[in-house]
């Protein structure tokens, strides 16, 4: 994604708020995140001076300073003595932050960011499936079997199917005992679950094929086959995304 600097008029354009937000600092932060990601304020350039931001958003200096502090915490800007507030390179941005990730996905026509997200999820969940196959007790195995059977009944109801889909993956993650891995995956999923770019094509055929993958994962965990469970999870997450994905080009980050 290449940032394209915008005109000074656009950079100082007031946001199209239909009503004045209750939390002004949060609203200003969200707007500035979007502008930075879009390239209105490119990496290496300074944010507009404080008085300009106050005028643009019709807010006080206190609100602007709070918003800039939040942008610093997200890794989008650095305050430099004598140089002002500088926009940082994308490599410094906190991509686990909801606003940053959401804005980046919205601007990324190539879907590369979602490819990276899926690749990250695939690595973590494959490892957790490996551990789950070694640790899963009868209760976990029964739960996974029940979810697979329930999803077989829901292939004509994608919305309900996806709820059980998430429950299946969460059961595997919980069975692994990896709280950090589970937290990262759940955080990533929570931030993209309502994105049409991420959900993509999810009709009956997708649900049927997807649940074949779930059944394979369940069978390998039930057989206490760590390597097989990891491979089944890796293949399932890859195949499911390739089917849902509707962007240009090949998802090269997923090729192995």
Question: Where does each model-flagged region fall?
Answer:
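Short linear motifs at protein or domain termini
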Residues: 1-123, 130, 250-254
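Short helix-capping and inter-helix turn/linker motifs at the boundaries of alpha-helical repeat units
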Residues: 23, 207-208
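Hydrophobic alpha-helical elements and their junctions with loops/disorder across both membrane
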Residues: 32, 55, 69, 74, ...
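Juxtamembrane helix-loop transition sites at the ends of transmembrane segments
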Residues: 61, 71, 195-198, 246
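Juxtamembrane/interface motifs at transmembrane-helix termini
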Residues: 65, 161-165, 201-206, 248-254
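Conserved amphipathic alpha-helical segments that form helical-bundle/coiled-coil interaction surfaces
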Residues: 117-198, 210-219, 228-243
